[in-house]
Amino acid sequence: MAKQIVFDDDARGPLLAGVSKLARAVRSTLGPRGRNAVLDKGWGSPKVTKDGVTVAEDIELDDPFENLGAQLVKEAASKTNDVAGDGTTTATVLSEAIFREGLKMVATGADPMALSRGIQKAVDTAIAQIAKMATPINEKSKSDIKQVATIAGNNDPQIGDVLADAFTKVGKNGVITVEEGRSNETYVDVVEGMQFDRGFLSPHFVTNQDEVTVELDDCYILLFEEKISNNKKMIPLLEAISKAKKPLLIIAEDTEGEALATLVVNKMRGILSACAVKAPGYGDRRKAILGDIAALTGGKAIFKDLGIDLESVKVSDLGRAKQIRITSEATTIVGGAGKKADIEGRVAQIRREIEATDSDYDREKLQERLAKLAGGVAQINVGAATETEMKERKALIDDARAATQAALEEGIVPGGGTALLRCRAAVEKLEKATEGDQKLGVRIIRNVLDQPMRAIANNAGLDGAVVVNRVLQMKGKTEGYDANADKYCDLVAAGIVDPAKVVRTSLTNAASVAALLLTTESLVTEIPVEEEPAGGDHHDHGMGGGMPDMGGMGMGGMGGMGGMGGMGGMM
């Protein structure tokens, strides 16, 4: 496939045009008075959203060079969303502003590489200021969490209430999932203890016939990595547990054949209350989860590489739990008898693995394991009147959840673009201490720190420049403009706050992408191929000169059939 190449200003011009188109579409959604964007999905009903990253991800431009710029900025928005869960619109607005300011400097002869280094220095300074400004929030305070969640949820107090309820129930280490509900109400379901998606292997184990569940109190738990099919190896252990008059849960790769039949018969005869479920996960992940359950219940996971046979397993090797509830689809362990030190050690190990992994999938699975050990699992069931509203609301709550999690991690700063604006003084100080073209790079960041506030004010129907100047004249570090109430006030006291992690990530990713764009000297894309029309009329001789008479097969030639009405005689 042939390629087309452009250089220098011919490359940077289309890049800026593409970035500007994307930023203009996304910018209009910023702030409490931001406007909606309507996205045509090509099927079903159109999607109405105020979520910046959703708008950005839907944009593809015709011009291949412009599209390169748009796609790079889209990546900044997506990365911000992945890391912090919010701040995607801010990242897009800042990317465009930094790139636009940088191009002005390049046009006057500045070295793009020196500009890039200056930009990075200024960003590091601003990030240090954001960290100083950040105030930790109390994870047990429902009102603190509600403030952050309400702002992240587009100033919807119901979203704030629901997320505050979820976080106070499971803590910052808990997992909160957002699912589509089956009613108009939005509510939280909390699963206490450890739950995994494996159900009973036989309906004969059921103890509660009304709810079709197995309920085992003060229960022993056998954790076995391999399949169990030989009942002879299992009988010594079953006899010991039967004497103790306690129920037994077997978690193994599978329990089948004679072994399963023995458990069922003993259960039905009232000799031993038992149940068997398959171990969750596969391969190394299964080993890890069995290790988690062992820590939680104070038992020992019997792995095949330990060389321990089922016959030699003692009652002291088993875990214990106050209550176990098993449905056909899931097992929940509540009140494990594990030592606190062992559980905390396991939690610390999982946290180290989370920090070390580069895989988003692995990180998500590790966080699920962490939640089941350290917190709990809360499911938010989203209710709405229509499917379109449901999808929009679900996306909004999911973003607000991630932003609230970010606030619990790194604290909060004044919202409404104020935190970035308050970094300007420190960046100005750095500018005075920097020389050459790097000084111009620092100046670029100084000039763009007001852009998010300008966009919020413009969307609220005010002059952004006037609002920025008014806020700069205010002496309090937490004072700024509340676009929702249309007033100037102490934003933290009014509950207008942003997670520090969101602000930091937005600026970092925006500067990274803008610096890449500024140091671009050439663009290479495939030459667009114009597609042939799908069908031609009877004058189209595209089939080649060898078959000229095929023109008569055009739709016009079907008139000779006398019209479909003539088929009436066949009825």
UniProtKB/Swiss-Prot annotation:
Q: What is its EC number?
A: 5.6.1.7
Alphabetical list of SUPFAM superfamilies matching this protein? GroEL apical domain-like, GroEL equatorial domain-like, GroEL-intermediate domain like
Tell me which residues bind ATP. Answer: 29-32, 50, 86-90, 416, 498
The cellular location(s) given in this protein's UniProt record come to: Cytoplasm
Q: Name one GO cellular component term.
A: GroEL-GroES complex
Catalysed reactions, as listed in the record: ATP + H2O + a folded polypeptide = ADP + phosphate + an unfolded polypeptide
Q: Where mainly found? A: cytoplasm
What one GO molecular function would you report for this record? Answer: ATP binding
Q: Which Pfam families match?
A: Cpn60_TCP1 (PF00118)
Q: Which cysteines are joined by disulfide bonds?
A: none
One BP term from GO? response to heat
Family annotation (CDD domains) = GroEL (cd03344)
* Top-level taxon: Bacteria
Keywords for the protein's UniProt record, in alphabetical order: ATP-binding, Chaperone, Cytoplasm, Isomerase, Nucleotide-binding
Q: What is the documented function of this protein?
A: Together with its co-chaperonin GroES, plays an essential role in assisting protein folding. The GroEL-GroES system forms a nano-cage that allows encapsulation of the non-native substrate proteins and provides a physical environment optimized to promote and accelerate protein folding.
Q: Which family does it belong to?
A: Belongs to the chaperonin (HSP60) family.
Subunit text: Forms a cylinder of 14 subunits composed of two heptameric rings stacked back-to-back. Interacts with the co-chaperonin GroES.
Any idea what this protein is called? Chaperonin GroEL 1
Whichever gene encodes this chain, its name is groEL1
